[in-house]
Amino acid sequence: MPPPRPPCHPTGFRHFDEFLEGGLPCGRAVEFLAPPGSGKTTLVLRLAAACQRHGLRVALLAADGSLTPAYAKAQGLDPAAVLWIDPALGERALSVAQRLLAEQVAGLLVLDAPDALGLPRHAFRPLSRALASSQALCLITRPRASFTPAPLLRNPLRLLLYPEAIEASNGRRALRPIK
């Protein structure tokens, strides 16, 4: 008998939910790895908008400072309801994110390009522990060039995004999990 599936939040995208066997897993990070300019931030913001419509409070840390409320709104998010974490805080930004998860203020944390913070991997450990002990979600965008970077948080679901396959008729070849 297979182990029971952890709770998940449907994304609202049928093929994506089928691929994830029900939706985004609670208490776990999902890393989207793809080349720069491939649409991973747009995809993650649209997934966040779907979660927001289902009642989750969204916190967003755009480490490179490139995300604007206008862009978030264009992807379906209500920017006035988003908890924006200032990347200029550096390591303190991770502490803010960790507290939002630990105190159940946010049900979804989006980390856009967290490598741009320039922090060592061990700085992400408290955030990883807070996520594991909650039912929150964490969506992470990271670049993928000729290598796959080491995970930032413990036990993430890592997905490679293949932009050249997005035009596929069923859309299923656009994502591949990393084992």
List the predicted regions and their residue ranges.
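Phosphate-binding/switch region of NTP-binding enzymes
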Residues: R129, A136-K179
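Conserved nucleotide-binding/hydrolysis micro-motifs of P-loop NTPases
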Residues: D64-L67, A88-E91, D115-L117, R144-T148, ...
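Structural motif
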Residues: L61-A63, I85, T141
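Short, solvent-exposed amphipathic alpha-helical segments in soluble enzyme
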Residues: Q75-L77, P126, N155
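Phosphate-binding/switch loop-helix module in NTP-utilizing enzymes
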Residues: P87-L139
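The Walker A/P-loop phosphate-binding site
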Residues: M1-P79, E91-A102
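Short, well-ordered secondary-structure micro-motifs
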Residues: A70-Y71, S95, R121, P149-L152
